[in-house]
């Protein structure tokens, strides 16, 4: 998180989502979260394996973990759940395992907002890193991760800094 400066569009995303309230919860799956998860998967990844997950599969993803894991729920002021992030607590940072959100809010960049929230949270906790999670550089659906500079990737030679989005 050191050296990260949000871009103009990221600052706009923070402003547009300023009504969203985040709360950290134990890694416990709820029907409300699962309902949002299903809507998200059907809208964003209908051909993916996760789209066919039932509640027990979702519960396993959330609760069966060998590390300290928690859920961040993001709600509108009315209390409506609009995004969820499954997050691992590591000794040196936070790791974004998976996030999902209400598809009709896509115009407000909820995925970016959730990442920015985690970066701010890592900074407030004095943690040096926020791990964006698994990344396939050739996947258009994962291309957004390259916007969060400075960025490091783990390769067979260790951690390597990327100098720009173009070096991906």
Model-derived features with residue positions:
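A conserved beta-strand-loop-helix scaffold within acyl/acetyltransferase catalytic domains
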Residues: 1-107, 147
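Residue-level preference for non-acidic, small/hydrophobic
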Residues: 37, 115-118, 145
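Active-site scaffold segments
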Residues: 88, 116, 133
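Nucleic-acid nuclease catalytic cores
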Residues: 94, 102-108, 127-130, 134-138
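Conserved acetyl-CoA-binding loop-helix of GNAT-fold acetyltransferases
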Residues: 107-119
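Conserved acyl-CoA
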Residues: 116-128
């Amino acid at each position: 998180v050191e050296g990260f400066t949000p871009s103009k569009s990221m600052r706009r995303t923070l402003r547009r989502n300023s009504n969203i309230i985040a709360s950290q919860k134990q890694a416990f799956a709820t029907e409300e979260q699962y309902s949002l998860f299903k809507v998200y998967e059907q809208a964003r990844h209908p051909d993916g394996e996760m789209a066919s997950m039932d509640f027990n599969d979702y519960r396993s993803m959330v609760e069966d973990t060998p590390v300290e894991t928690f859920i961040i729920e993001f709600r509108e002021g009315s209390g409506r759940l609009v995004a969820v992030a499954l997050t691992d607590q590591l000794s040196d940072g936070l790791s974004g395992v998976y996030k999902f959100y209400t598809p009709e809010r896509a115009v407000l960049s909820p995925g970016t907002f959730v990442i920015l929230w985690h970066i701010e949270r890592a900074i407030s906790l004095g943690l040096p890193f926020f791990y964006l999670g698994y990344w396939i550089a050739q996947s258009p659906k994962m291309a957004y991760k390259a916007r969060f500079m400075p960025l490091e990737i783990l390769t067979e030679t260790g951690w390597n800094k990327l100098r720009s989005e173009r070096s991906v």
